[in-house]
Amino acid sequence: MIGTLQSGGVSKSIVNLLNVMDRTTYDVHLLLLDRAGDILSPYLPSDITVHVNREIENLHRGLRGVRALLFTGHLLLAFGSLLRMLMSKISRAWAGRWLAYLMPRFTDLTFDLIIDYGGQQQLYYMVDKLDGKKKITFFHNDYSKWPYYYAADRLYYPKVDQILSISQTCVDVLKAYFPDCKDKISVMQNISSPVLITKQANETVDLPIAPLLLVSLGHIMRRKGTDFSIDAAKILQKNGVEFKWMLVGKVVEKDLIRRIEQEGLADRFVVLGIRSNPYPYIKAADIYVHPARFEGKSIALDEAKILCKPIIVTNFSTVNDQFEDRVNASICEMNGDALADAIIELAANKELRQSYVAYLNAHIVDNSSEVEKLYTFID
């Protein structure tokens, strides 16, 4: 079960997971809560059953969904959805529980294993409304940076068979928040396929031309550090660095695009928006820059590692689960000055860039076997 199949890391992660599952042995179903912005469904295996429900979709679509519910005669659901939007201003946890309550039961099937891949209302819906012999929930981030649903999670985590997260740091944080559940909290990494990523990276795309080509993959928003990128770009431009910076991802905070224009950086940034295949842009870049404020275990960074790019990354709480400073990446402080300094240094230091590339080349890992952790829960 997943919320959307947009361009985010969780969406890409579940697509990768579904592609490596043993579908000759298991009958695999996917409940997709909302098809809005879906760009990854072409990459789903053709032999899985995808379930969608119009009422569930409209409950996830804000005021537009309320209008659709009214138009189709679902007056109580429309009122309930409005109430949920008001509740979310007070408590995301209870708004999430209310949304799960509103979501209709989509099937009477009993599953051997149900996996909630997104948490929050998906977790509550899975526990309360779906029949499964075993139930697993995922949390794809550092819980200390995203504790908004704690009041509800503490009631629902004891009801599932396993709680999975994507790195040891994330697991340790979950155990600190939910000590009574610590024995059923464990690691399952995001799955990234080197073969598939390398193949997709060879597709032809139009690219900007510059002596220094940078790329960042992620939503354009402060959480992903786009403001740090703008600050750094100002410094690079002031220092006479000739560069283009590709931003691949959904524009979430539009004021950041306005700021790019106001700062006179419109000819420096290339805002590409959402791309179903971002890998040619990563492959073409001289440096991959990841300025996020926090992450769980970034699948975008795993992909940049597979493509063996020199990487600059900020020192968010889980960064050491993926990187060692000056071994396989340059790790910098979370501000524009530090980011600019790291870019200038790495762009000028060919030997350092080559050392990162050599290390990454020697440590490419296909972790498709992670899927076997799920099979242990099926009788």
State what each model feature region is:
Residues 11-16, 212-235, 247:
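A conserved mid-protein helix/loop that constitutes part of the nucleotide-sugar donor-binding site
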Residues 30-38, 217, 221-223, 244-256:
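Glycosyltransferase donor-sugar binding loop
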Residues 134-140, 144, 158-199:
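Donor nucleotide-sugar binding/catalytic pocket of nucleotide-sugar-dependent glycosyltransferases
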Residues 237, 338, 345, 352-367, ...:
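A short, well-ordered alpha-helix in the C-terminal region of glycosyltransferases
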Residues 274, 293:
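Aromatic "clamp/platform" in nucleotide-sugar-dependent glycosyltransferases that forms part
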Residues 303, 315-326, 330-331:
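Short acidic/histidine- and often glycine-rich active-site loop of Leloir-type glycosyltransferases
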Residues 310-314:
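Short hydrophobic beta-strand element within catalytic cores of glycosyltransferases
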Residues 325-326, 330-337, 345-350:
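Conserved acidic donor-binding segment of nucleotide-sugar-dependent glycosyltransferases
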